[in-house]
């Protein structure tokens, strides 16, 4: 984008547009079936260590470390096939693509996601989201730390961020202030955990599912005009 838009929509992916929790559950079941429950727990322990180390989910990196001691297991190579051929398009939340199309009809729309540089873009493409936003995709390690770069890529007077993590939305709001409208989607385990946390500032809008945005208008995402008190005659 060369000229500043009035508004740009920024959309998260995992548990916002697609059910990543279900993917994780099915991945765990697949590992358990192939290697046993103990090895499944080992995979998730490696995954957790990598997430703490890198700051993002790295399913492929966890699999790479997981292979230690299992090189002679025929099922190991099938796990890479499972990850790369996983049908993410089937994990889209109801009306997710319709919602993206609706938002694009209102204003420029881009995906702003966290993750590794290989599997996360693959997931976005496989789900059909890359084409849905016409390739307008950003994937960072910590997107809330990349707001300057995001604004340079998509200059706008105002932004609307749609995400399932209320604390992340609050952090972004503290940085951009009134130039950002935050939309909290109550989907997934981060959203559930957020119900018991103090969120400051709170989200501007809270919705139960991504499909609700299909009924919203442009003005719903723009800052309200200030109320000016008139002097009495």
Locate the predicted segments by residue.
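Active-site neighborhood of HAD-like aspartate-dependent phosphohydrolases
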Residues: 1-45, 69
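Asp-based, Mg2+/Mn2+-dependent phosphohydrolase catalytic module
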Residues: 1-6, 125-161, 165-233
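Short hydrophobic segments within beta-strands
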Residues: 12-13, 112, 162, 185
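Conserved SAM-binding loop
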Residues: 17, 109, 161
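A metal-dependent, Asp-based hydrolase signature
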Residues: 23, 34-38, 47-84, 102
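Short, acidic loop-to-helix structural element flanking the phosphoryl-transfer center
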Residues: 60-61, 81-111, 141-144, 148
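Helix N-cap/beta->alpha junction signal
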Residues: 93, 113-115, 165
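Substrate-recognition/cap helix-loop segment adjacent to the acidic, metal-dependent catalytic center
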Residues: 97-110, 114-138
């Amino acid at each position: 984008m060369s000229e500043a838009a009035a508004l740009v929509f920024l959309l998260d992916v995992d548990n916002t547009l697609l059910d990543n929790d279900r993917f994780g559950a099915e991945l765990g079941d697949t590992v358990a079936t192939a290697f046993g429950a103990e090895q499944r727990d080992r995979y998730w322990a490696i995954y957790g260590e990598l997430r703490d180390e890198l700051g993002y989910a790295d399913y492929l990196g966890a699999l790479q470390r997981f292979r230690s001691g299992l090189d002679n297991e025929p099922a190991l190579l099938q796990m890479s096939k499972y990850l790369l051929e996983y049908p993410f398009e089937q994990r889209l939340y109801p009306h997710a693509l319709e919602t993206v199309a609706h938002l694009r009809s209102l204003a420029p729309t881009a995906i702003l996601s966290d993750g590794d540089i290989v599997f996360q873009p693959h997931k976005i493409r496989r789900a059909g989201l890359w084409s849905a936003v016409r390739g307008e995709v950003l994937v960072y390690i910590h997107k809330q730390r990349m707001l300057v770069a995001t604004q340079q890529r998509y200059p706008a007077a105002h932004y609307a961020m749609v995400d399932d993590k209320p604390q992340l939305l609050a952090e972004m709001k503290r940085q951009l202030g009134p130039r950002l409208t935050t939309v909290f989607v109550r989907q997934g385990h981060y959203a559930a955990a957020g119900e018991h946390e103090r969120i400051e500032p709170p989200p501007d809008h809270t919705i139960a599912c991504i499909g609700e945005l299909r009924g919203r208008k442009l003005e719903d995402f723009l800052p309200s005009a200030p109320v000016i008190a008139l002097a009495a005659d």
